Design a protein with these regions (language model features):
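Conserved, mostly hydrophobic/aromatic
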Residues: 6, 18, 38, 46, ...
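Local beta-strand N-terminus motif with an aromatic residue
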Residues: 13, 46, 69-70, 97-100, ...
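Conserved residues at the C-terminal ends of beta-strands
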Residues: 19, 49, 103-106, 143, ...
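Glycine/proline-rich, positively charged
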Residues: 29, 36, 81-189, 194
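N-terminal binding-site loop/beta-alpha segment at the start of enzyme catalytic domains
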Residues: 1-70
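Short catalytic-loop micro-motif centered on adjacent basic/acidic residues
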Residues: 44-49, 73-74, 138-141, 161-165, ...
Length: 344
């Protein structure tokens, strides 16, 4: 499988990686088999997170005896220095390893949070640097869903990799973020290649991403058949045919008016409604086990705030994609109520 240099990390990673969210839904034995199949097919980049319940532990078991053949990336949400240190040690224990190749700040979507991380006196970046000096982590990365924040993160030159949503509908990174990553020699990791499950044509999705030679893509894998299909795409013809381009344009037209990119330009909401979280709730249902979102410390509280909508329409006036936000909020909340009732 083709490998590329992951920016200034210098790591030679496969262009096709592994995303560790879906294996939470599997039995441990099946999860281990899926990860090991990825390794057998040549995939050498595995992504997970402290918050993905059983994912780290299952990856740790899957790579037993093959640790030095793979690169493991995991992440932590920002917190206090003590919390970061505890999360890192927990990840090392779960993964059954004494080092993590890339440790990432998870979901940094605004300048204020980034500024706190990079504060020269008390920033959490210092905790990561300390861990790097101790040999617990080898490279420092960051993940984001918000373009303005992502640009600042790249321009800071403090991080070696960035992970960001990218697919042929959420295609803004092609012009706005990838050129910046090239300029700063920053590794670019693609999340949401299938738009969180909204796109179902794997061939189109991955052939589109194969047009960007510096991109490492980490689809969430749940079945052996999925990784076999995607690996075959990466080994096959990479040029997009006229017929495929036509299908792509049709799907953009069909989904573009109902697809939240989580840019959060609709915010702030006077009622404190987490708009993008509620509108993208259907992707949680598709990708995650119910306990993950129903017992989350913040998702149920956020979903309930949908009832506070006053229908003012301010969010819709700010949306650069002209989404019917008020209608989509109702749909997201109704789905939440259905899932909650089914899992009582």
């Amino acid at each position: 499988m083709e490998k590329i240099k992951l920016g200034k990390t210098g790591l030679m990673v496969t262009r096709l990686g592994f995303g560790g969210i879906p294996i939470q839904r599997l039995t441990e034995a099946d999860a281990v088999k899926v990860v090991q199949k990825c390794l057998d097919l040549g995939v050498n980049y595995l992504d997970t997170a402290n918050g993905y319940t059983t994912s780290e532990e299952r990856i740790g078991k899957a790579v037993k005896g093959r640790r030095h053949d793979v690169f493991i990336a995991t992440k932590t949400f920002p917190g206090t220095p003590d919390i970061i240190e505890k999360n890192l040690d927990l990840s090392l224990k779960r993964l059954d390893t004494d080092y993590i190749d890339i440790y990432q700040f998870h979901g940094i979507n605004d300048k204020a949070t980034l500024d706190k991380i990079l504060d020269p006196e008390n920033g959490l970046y210092k905790v990561f640097e300390k861990a790097k000096q101790a040999g617990k982590i080898r490279h420092i990365g960051i993940t984001s869903h918000q373009m303005d924040a992502a640009k600042l993160e790249v321009q800071s030159d403090k991080f070696e990799t960035i992970m960001f949503p990218f697919n042929f509908i959420t295609n803004e990174p092609a012009k706005e973020l990838l050129p910046l990553c090239r300029e700063h020699d920053m590794g670019f990791i693609v999340m949401k290649p299938l738009a969180g499950g909204m796109l179902d044509d794997a061939m189109l999705c991955f052939k589109y991403l194969l047009q960007f030679p510096e991109a490492v893509t980490i689809p969430g894998i749940e079945k052996i058949s999925e990784i076999e299909e995607i690996a075959a795409i990466y080994e096959g013809p990479k040029k997009i045919t006229p017929a495929e381009f036509t299908r792509m344009k049709r799907m953009i037209t069909e989904l573009g008016t109902r697809f939240c990119r989580r840019c959060d330009y609709c915010q702030p909401c006077d009622q404190g409604i987490p708009i993008s979280m509620i509108m993208t709730f259907p992707t949680f249902v598709k990708r995650l086990p119910p306990d993950w979102y129903l017992k989350s410390p913040f998702i149920p509280e956020g979903m309930e705030k949908a009832k506070n909508c006053t229908e003012c329409g301010e969010c819709e006036s700010r949306c650069p994609f002209n989404l019917p936000i008020r209608e989509m909020l109702k749909e997201g909340y109704n789905l939440y109520e259905q899932v909650k009732a089914a899992n009582i």
